[in-house]
């Protein structure tokens, strides 16, 4: 039996993907059956971190070492990730959500529809307020765009109003939100998005 929802979490290195996965797990683990697959190029660092901080029980977390280009492992040849997801689904047949965190990649990264049902794409304010208008599949076509680290805007000279305008223009009707995952600001918007996807999922 497959999980009700396979949710990809992608974005550049350091944008806050692992922080988002941890926050989702901590907030929803008491009401949903969750599991996580992380991707790193040469290590299992993110999986080890999530285990160390107790985001979920260790047996619900899988680390995938992609080698080479992390984009390939979630798009062109996602077999290693699909195997990890299917293994979790066999071990936990009542899973509601499997979160698949990509390795850090560029704005062109996107998940194969064979691997995930929906994708959250995470960027951060520290990369500059021009990022939303640069476009790319993550910016324009992800199911939810998360603009993280809003607390750093003043420190890096980023204008949140510019980012708001550009994100709205680039995404049209697709949702997006600001977050500061360190403090939890904006997390409710992400959780609400995730929960809204579940009731209509096929069993």
UniProtKB/Swiss-Prot annotation:
InterPro entries the record matches: CobW/HypB/UreG_nucleotide-bd (IPR003495), P-loop_NTPase (IPR027417), UreG (IPR004400)
Keywords: Chaperone, Cytoplasm, GTP-binding, Nickel insertion, Nucleotide-binding
Organism superkingdom: Bacteria
Keyword set includes Glycoprotein: no
A Pfam match: cobW
A single cellular component GO annotation: cytoplasm
Gene Ontology MF, one: nickel cation binding
Binding site for GTP: 11-18
GO BP terms: urea catabolic process
Compartments, as annotated in UniProt: Cytoplasm
Function summary: Facilitates the functional incorporation of the urease nickel metallocenter. This process requires GTP hydrolysis, probably effectuated by UreG.
Family: Belongs to the SIMIBI class G3E GTPase family. UreG subfamily.
Subunit and interaction comment: Homodimer. UreD, UreF and UreG form a complex that acts as a GTP-hydrolysis-dependent molecular chaperone, activating the urease apoprotein by helping to assemble the nickel containing metallocenter of UreC. The UreE protein probably delivers the nickel.
Name of the protein described by the UniProt record: Urease accessory protein UreG
């Amino acid at each position: 039996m497959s999980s009700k929802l396979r949710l990809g979490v992608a974005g550049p290195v350091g944008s806050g993907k692992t922080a988002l996965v941890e926050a989702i797990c901590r907030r929803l683990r008491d009401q949903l059956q969750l599991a996580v697959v992380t991707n790193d190029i040469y290590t299992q660092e993110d999986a080890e971190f999530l285990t160390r901080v107790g985001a979920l029980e260790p047996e619900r977390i899988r680390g995938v070492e992609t080698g080479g280009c992390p984009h390939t492992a979630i798009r062109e040849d996602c077999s290693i990730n699909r195997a990890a997801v299917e293994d979790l689904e066999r071990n936990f047949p009542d899973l509601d959500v499997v979160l698949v965190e990509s390795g850090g990649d560029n704005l062109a990264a996107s998940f194969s529809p064979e691997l995930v049902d929906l994708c959250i794409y995470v960027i951060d304010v520290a990369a500059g307020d021009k990022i939303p208008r640069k476009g790319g599949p993550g910016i324009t076509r992800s199911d939810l765009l998360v603009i993280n680290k809003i607390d750093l805007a003043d420190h890096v000279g980023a204008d949140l109003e510019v980012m708001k305008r550009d994100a709205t223009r680039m995404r049209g009707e697709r949702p997006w939100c600001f977050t500061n995952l360190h403090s939890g600001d904006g997390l409710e918007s992400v959780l609400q998005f995730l929960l809204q996807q579940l009731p209509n999922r096929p069993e």
